[in-house]
Amino acid sequence: MSSFEDKKTTGITFNIQKYSVHDGPGIRTVVFLKGCPLRCRWCSNPESQRRRIELAYNTGRCLTLTKCVRCVEVCTMNAITRADDDTISIDRALCEECGMFCAEACPSKALITYGTTRTVDEVLNVVEQDSVFYARSGGGITLSGGEPFAQPAFALALLREARRRHIHTAVETCGYASWSDMEPALEYVKFVHYDIKSLDDEKHRSATGVSNVRIIENLRNIRSRFPALKVVVRTPVIPGFNDTEEDIRAIARLTAELEVEYQLLPYHRLGTQKYTFLDRQAPMGEVVLDEQVMTALNAVVAAEHATDG
């Protein structure tokens, strides 16, 4: 596809985060794409899961106590009504992609939208604003999500056009995508963060809603098809799910076999408020991860990779 066609390709993003230092080498701009095939119980970005633009409601900012009903007046779907407690009620079965006039009309920004339709050119024009930092640090653009390959045409066009502009490219993926969508995009990628939650398929299905078979197959495909591509496998350590030496040792052995770096990410509770904004319940509740558990699991990883070396 030509550069002109790639630039006009559109997709839905929910954030563009500048000056990130944890999403690949150097200083990076992370582009978050909406849509994810997994429903991880610990997801800290619930607004990333659905591919469509969504309406969020922060009751703490609402001005209904001052008799403001601008959102009710402009809603074209009759999805918003005033509730008895002087807040508003949103019928999300009726609330669809209607232009989100309610969010535009809300004077206090109690109503906001998660998701913006952008062209590749619009995204990369933002990314290029920090080109001087990339040049000095070895950074660039990272596609994250959600799952970038849930919007395969947009992801491919972004990566291909970024490379045309000499921007270093990275992807953060859960690995659950068709290989036919991943392979052409990976031709334009220099670095991959690859998530593996568990090698126990039954456990994986229970916690994420999908099998891990495709995820493991795609990791092996990447190593065989793109042996020079830098891959770092990461596992979020989740209390009550995979926080055992048995779980982590299994993944550590796989990564040692495939000769890829392996990192553990401690569970955190960031993002729980966003569930409330979307009228959803945060699935994990109040659980916390014991620091001593993380220390022990990191020792397991070090031992397995030391044995491999």
Swiss-Prot record:
<dbReference type="GO" id="GO:0016491">
    <property type="term" value="F:oxidoreductase activity"/>
</dbReference>
<feature type="binding site">
    <location>
        <begin position="42"/>
        <end position="44"/>
    </location>
    <ligand>
        <name>S-adenosyl-L-methionine</name>
    </ligand>
</feature>
<dbReference type="GO" id="GO:0046306">
    <property type="term" value="P:alkanesulfonate catabolic process"/>
</dbReference>
<feature type="domain" description="4Fe-4S ferredoxin-type 2">
    <location>
        <begin position="86"/>
        <end position="117"/>
    </location>
</feature>
<feature type="binding site">
    <location>
        <position position="106"/>
    </location>
    <ligand>
        <name>[4Fe-4S] cluster 2</name>
    </ligand>
</feature>
<dbReference type="GO" id="GO:0046872">
    <property type="term" value="F:metal ion binding"/>
</dbReference>
<dbReference type="InterPro" id="IPR040074">
    <property type="entry name" value="BssD/PflA/YjjW"/>
</dbReference>
<keyword id="KW-0949">S-adenosyl-L-methionine</keyword>
<keyword id="KW-0004">4Fe-4S</keyword>
<dbReference type="GO" id="GO:0051539">
    <property type="term" value="F:4 iron, 4 sulfur cluster binding"/>
</dbReference>
<feature type="binding site">
    <location>
        <position position="62"/>
    </location>
    <ligand>
        <name>[4Fe-4S] cluster 2</name>
    </ligand>
</feature>
<keyword id="KW-0408">Iron</keyword>
<dbReference type="InterPro" id="IPR034457">
    <property type="entry name" value="Organic_radical-activating"/>
</dbReference>
<dbReference type="InterPro" id="IPR013785">
    <property type="entry name" value="Aldolase_TIM"/>
</dbReference>
<comment type="pathway">
    <text>Organosulfur degradation; alkanesulfonate degradation.</text>
</comment>
<comment type="function">
    <text>Involved in an anaerobic respiration pathway that converts the sulfonate isethionate (2-hydroxyethanesulfonate) to ammonia, acetate and sulfide. Catalyzes activation of the isethionate sulfite-lyase IslA under anaerobic conditions by generation of an organic free radical on a glycine residue, via a homolytic cleavage of S-adenosyl-L-methionine (SAM).</text>
</comment>
<feature type="binding site">
    <location>
        <position position="268"/>
    </location>
    <ligand>
        <name>S-adenosyl-L-methionine</name>
    </ligand>
</feature>
<feature type="binding site">
    <location>
        <position position="98"/>
    </location>
    <ligand>
        <name>[4Fe-4S] cluster 3</name>
    </ligand>
</feature>
<feature type="binding site">
    <location>
        <position position="102"/>
    </location>
    <ligand>
        <name>[4Fe-4S] cluster 3</name>
    </ligand>
</feature>
<feature type="binding site">
    <location>
        <position position="43"/>
    </location>
    <ligand>
        <name>[4Fe-4S] cluster 1</name>
    </ligand>
</feature>
<comment type="similarity">
    <text>Belongs to the organic radical-activating enzymes family.</text>
</comment>
<keyword id="KW-0411">Iron-sulfur</keyword>
<dbReference type="InterPro" id="IPR001989">
    <property type="entry name" value="Radical_activat_CS"/>
</dbReference>
<feature type="binding site">
    <location>
        <position position="75"/>
    </location>
    <ligand>
        <name>[4Fe-4S] cluster 3</name>
    </ligand>
</feature>
<feature type="binding site">
    <location>
        <position position="95"/>
    </location>
    <ligand>
        <name>[4Fe-4S] cluster 3</name>
    </ligand>
</feature>
<keyword id="KW-0560">Oxidoreductase</keyword>
<feature type="binding site">
    <location>
        <position position="68"/>
    </location>
    <ligand>
        <name>[4Fe-4S] cluster 2</name>
    </ligand>
</feature>
<keyword id="KW-0479">Metal-binding</keyword>
<feature type="binding site">
    <location>
        <position position="36"/>
    </location>
    <ligand>
        <name>[4Fe-4S] cluster 1</name>
    </ligand>
</feature>
<dbReference type="Pfam" id="PF04055">
    <property type="entry name" value="Radical_SAM"/>
</dbReference>
<dbReference type="InterPro" id="IPR007197">
    <property type="entry name" value="rSAM"/>
</dbReference>
<feature type="binding site">
    <location>
        <begin position="195"/>
        <end position="197"/>
    </location>
    <ligand>
        <name>S-adenosyl-L-methionine</name>
    </ligand>
</feature>
<feature type="binding site">
    <location>
        <position position="71"/>
    </location>
    <ligand>
        <name>[4Fe-4S] cluster 2</name>
    </ligand>
</feature>
<dbReference type="InterPro" id="IPR012839">
    <property type="entry name" value="Organic_radical_activase"/>
</dbReference>
<dbReference type="Pfam" id="PF13353">
    <property type="entry name" value="Fer4_12"/>
</dbReference>
<feature type="binding site">
    <location>
        <position position="146"/>
    </location>
    <ligand>
        <name>S-adenosyl-L-methionine</name>
    </ligand>
</feature>
<feature type="domain" description="Radical SAM core">
    <location>
        <begin position="22"/>
        <end position="309"/>
    </location>
</feature>
<comment type="subunit">
    <text>Monomer.</text>
</comment>
<dbReference type="InterPro" id="IPR017896">
    <property type="entry name" value="4Fe4S_Fe-S-bd"/>
</dbReference>
<protein>
    <recommendedName>
        <fullName>Isethionate sulfite-lyase activating enzyme</fullName>
        <ecNumber>1.97.1.-</ecNumber>
    </recommendedName>
</protein>
<feature type="binding site">
    <location>
        <position position="40"/>
    </location>
    <ligand>
        <name>[4Fe-4S] cluster 1</name>
    </ligand>
</feature>
<feature type="domain" description="4Fe-4S ferredoxin-type 1">
    <location>
        <begin position="53"/>
        <end position="85"/>
    </location>
</feature>
